[in-house]
Each structure stands twice: as structure tokens, then as C-alpha cells.
């Protein structure tokens, strides 16, 4: 399906997290974060594998203690997907995981401490040729900013980011990306808009603490969608109180909806009504489950009646229109009649067969 609008992305420098390019002309990457105890190596490895299988490009791992840092070393030795070490409060943990092969160090300006601590982290990042993410969060701004602004604001977040960018500039370090996250959509959007016009470093997008799978998906889609539609953003993480695999799927659905990155089946389906000639909701649910393993982009339509079915089918690889009889379309042309009992199996078979020709 040919998009009617192309988003022109903001020009930015390019950095690498492991073998994944961030910024420049690289595709917008997707990441998630483990929620296991990092010291539980087996559980963390299992979750990293699940996140990777869902299609994530990067995985972030929380390193709250030196014990977790030592566990990270064991974990890093057993995975190939780039790992980002999430560091708060203790800069020495960042120094440790850099030695253990972290592909990126995430530090929080609000709690990492003094400039000399940051200087040591930067020196370590230089030694190991790894980038840093300056991760500004509205909920953990520096105390002087809390006093100055009295409450979190986009301006406070941008000031925090610019202060730390200045520190890195003075240390001759430009291998970094920035994030400005809040749980409130417009605070996040305004902060990114303000900062993006002042710097050309890659931007990591996210609505932090977005909430449950249902509500958090809506908040993240609106917030990230507003920014991405304006060309802002080089890597994204959807933060949900849910399985990290859900974060990956939602992130790709956001990118897919904006035609920024295609992955897997783009399933176009009607909401159904009394005109439907088969159970649209049941068929779509079953197909979504069966299509989870598909990575190659392909457009598929499932429409319950002839009002919009034929029209939608003309612009997809595989289309189904409800009727008497139901009609299956391939590449916009009528292919065959299909009875309700065979809908899911036949449609899946045709999709997988069409993938061979893409």
C-alpha cells in the first residue's frame, strides 16, 4: 500500500549501540527493558530472548548494584543483541559495566552526581568506544531545577539536558543520545520540540510510566505519534506496566502506522457490523496470533462485507471480502471463493505463499 505522505525526519548525527545505528539515515530502532531481577541471570536471559524474538533491536537492563553489574557480565557473554546498561545514583557501576561489555550507558542527570563523576564515566565510555544516553526524567530532575521551576516543566527538562550536553562537549565527547521523558504527553512533546531545534544529536523517545497495556498504548501512541509525525525521534521505547514483549509490538505498530518502519503483517480490518458475512473479530484475532512470527512486511485486509471490502482488497497483497460467497483477492484481483469454515486456514496459507514472492 503506497503512503500518501512521507515524513521527513530531522537531520541528526549517527551513533552506534553495538551494531545498531541510531540517527542519521538509520531506521528508527525499537527497544524494550527487562523487568526481571538482573541478578537472576536465567530469568533475565529468557526475557532478553523473548524481547529479541519479538523484533526489538536493543534491550536495556537495569543495573542497580555491583552484584547486578557482575550478573550483567555473565548475561552479556551469552547474548548477541546490544545491551544498554541502565545506571542511576552510583557512577562506579557505569565504570564496571563498561568493562563488562555494555553497548551503551544510560545515566540520569538528576541523580548521577558531580561533574567529576560524569567525567569518569565519559573517560570510560571513550576507552571502550561506547555511547552514553543522557536520560532526563521529569520525576527526577536535579534539585536546583526543582527549586527554580517549582514543578516539572518542559523548560526544566531541556535545561537539564543542555547542561549535561555542555559538560560532554567540554569533555570532547559527542557519542551520545538524549531523552526527555515525562508521563504527561504534552510536557514530553514540548520538551522534545524545544530541544530538537537546538541540537543535532540522536533522540530517544518515550512517554515514561505510561501505564497499563491498554491506556499506556494510547498515551504512547499519541505522544510518540505527535513527535514522529514531525520527524523527531531516532529510537523509541514504549513504557508499559506489562510484558516487555508488548512494548515491542506496540512500538512497531506505531512506526508501522506512520509508515516509518514496516515489519510483519499490516492487518487492515473493519470493526464489523450486522452486514458482516463472517465473524470478523474472531478471524482477525486468530490471524494476529498466527502471524506473530512473520517479519517481512505485507499488507492484508479482512473486511466483513462488500461495502468497503473490494476497495480495500485492491491495494493489498491478500484481501478477504465477506459476501455470498466470500471472495479472496491476491494483489488486488479476485482469486477464489472461500467458505466461512476455511477462512483462517486459507487466508494464512495465501499470506505465507505471497511472502515467497516478495
Curated annotation (Swiss-Prot):
Example GO molecular function: iron ion binding
Record-listed E.C. numbers: 1.17.7.3
Keywords for this protein: 4Fe-4S, Iron, Iron-sulfur, Isoprene biosynthesis, Metal-binding, Oxidoreductase
Needed co-factor(s): [4Fe-4S] cluster
Name of the protein: 4-hydroxy-3-methylbut-2-en-1-yl diphosphate synthase (flavodoxin)
Alphabetical list of HAMAP family matching this protein: IspG
Nucleotide-binding is among the record's keywords: no
Residues holding [4Fe-4S] cluster: 270, 273, 305, 312
Species of the source: Vesicomyosocius okutanii subsp. Calyptogena okutanii (strain HA)
Function: Converts 2C-methyl-D-erythritol 2,4-cyclodiphosphate (ME-2,4cPP) into 1-hydroxy-2-methyl-2-(E)-butenyl 4-diphosphate.
Family that this chain belongs to: Belongs to the IspG family.
Catalytic activity: (2E)-4-hydroxy-3-methylbut-2-enyl diphosphate + oxidized [flavodoxin] + H2O + 2 H(+) = 2-C-methyl-D-erythritol 2,4-cyclic diphosphate + reduced [flavodoxin]
Pfam family, one: GcpE
Record note on cofactor: Binds 1 [4Fe-4S] cluster.
InterPro entries in UniProt: Dihydropteroate_synth-like_sf, IspG_bac, IspG_bac-typ, NO2/SO3_Rdtase_4Fe4S_sf
Biological process (GO), any one: isopentenyl diphosphate biosynthetic process, methylerythritol 4-phosphate pathway
Pathway listed: Isoprenoid biosynthesis; isopentenyl diphosphate biosynthesis via DXP pathway; isopentenyl diphosphate from 1-deoxy-D-xylulose 5-phosphate: step 5/6
Record bears the keyword Phosphoprotein: no
EC main group: oxidoreductase
